[in-house]
Design a protein with these regions (language model features):
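Short N-terminal binding/cap micro-motifs at the start of the first secondary-structure element
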Residues: 13-17, 150, 219-221
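Catalytic core of DAGKc-family lipid kinases
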Residues: 5, 36, 75-207
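Conserved Motif II region of HX4D acyltransferases
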Residues: 64-65, 211, 287
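Glycine-rich phosphate/pyrophosphate-binding beta-alpha loops
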Residues: 144, 148, 212-226, 289
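ATP/NTP phosphate-donor binding region
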Residues: 1-60, 65-75, 102-114, 314, ...
Length: 320
């Protein structure tokens, strides 16, 4: 029987609201769970789970929990990972074909105990590898500055609690920030000074209202705001200080329809291998805010195998 290791973040959105999922794993055959209640618990919990030599390591939490586990793992050997979408937005889980109803993903995870590993639906993804000015390396899937930070701040202040969790709430926060930019309301219209170099080529030095970089195929609500055609795993999109026609171009931006997003109007998107940024303001990776100032270097980490608990789909293999 395959052994399943589960790292559960008791503070993640759905887990914090209802502890039933965490409790449901107790006493199950070939299931080993460690529960964390703060960031300092994670290294010990991860070591305890890996010592079990599991067939799969499931992350029961949200985007920030996945980011924390990937960062803690670094480049060390690890079993295939799976994600139980127990956070508030669960953007990472959706992109890794682990999104949807939590009860169904739980059943799919537990079913792996009796299924040959070669039949599991899996996909291979390269997380972001972000090196901080002090030498620390973070792992995740999504980096953002500018209106991305403003949107997350607004979401935390106004929408996070009660019925405000989920992808739709994140979308509402993004629309609120876009409206604030159109109305030129502070702080939503505050641009960032962000000197950047992509694969040795300096980006335009003008202030940017938005900057994002990701190795994901889709963001929350299925958004794909990338249209660069260069080679490279790192997709980067940014907007000028005053992008022209943002209101009517917003649907095209969220779906990456290049013909409606000319650079002359302040819309840019490129792909590459290595991105260097000089930051003086807060930035986020997978929804977690950081205030480190200085030079950040972003690239793609080695590919990691994930089990697609929602079943096979584009980019997944197995379970035929």
């Amino acid at each position: 029987m395959n052994r399943i290791a589960i790292l559960s973040n008791a503070g993640s959105g759905r887990n914090a609201r209802k502890a039933a999922l965490i409790e449901s794993f107790g006493g199950l055959t070939a299931v080993y769970q460690e529960v964390t209640r703060s960031a300092v618990d994670l290294p010990r919990a991860l070591e305890a789970l890996l010592a079990r030599n599991p067939s799969v390591l499931a992350i029961n939490g949200g985007d920030g929990t996945v980011h924390a586990v990937l960062t803690a793992l670094g480049d060390r050997p690890a079993p295939p990972l799976a994600v139980l979408p127990a956070g508030s937005t669960n953007m990472t889980a959706h992109d890794l074909r682990c999104g949807g109803r939590l009860s169904r993903r739980r059943r799919a995870l537990l079913a792996l105990r009796d299924l040959p590993a070669e039949t599991w639906p899996t996909l291979s993804r390269s997380p972001l590898a972000l090196r901080c000015p002090d030498g620390r390396e973070l792992r995740g899937f999504f980096f953002g500055m500018g209106m991305i930070v403003r949107g997350i701040e607004y979401w935390h202040a106004s929408l996070r609690h009660g019925g405000g969790a989920g992808e739709w709430a994140a979308g509402a926060a993004l629309l609120r920030v876009a409206l604030g930019m159109l109305r030129r309301e502070a702080p939503f219209d505050t641009p960032v000074q962000l000197p950047a170099v992509l694969d040795g080529d300096p980006l335009p030095p003008a202030p940017k209202s938005l900057f994002l970089a990701s190795t994901m195929q889709r963001l929350f609500l299925g958004m794909t705001p990338f249209w660069g055609r260069e080679a490279g795993p790192l997709a980067c999109t940014w907007l000028s200080d005053r992008p022209q026609g943002l209101g009517w171009r917003l649907p095209a931006l969220l779906s990456g329809r290049a013909r409606f997003l000319p650079a002359t109007a302040g819309f840019f998107s490129r792909r590459g291998e290595t991105l260097s940024l000089t930051v003086e303001e807060p930035w986020v990776i997978d929804g977690e805010a950081y205030t480190d100032e200085g030079t950040l270097t972003l690239g793609a980490a080695p590919p990691q195998t994930f089990v697609a608990l929602a079943g096979p789909g584009p980019g997944a293999k197995g379970a035929k």
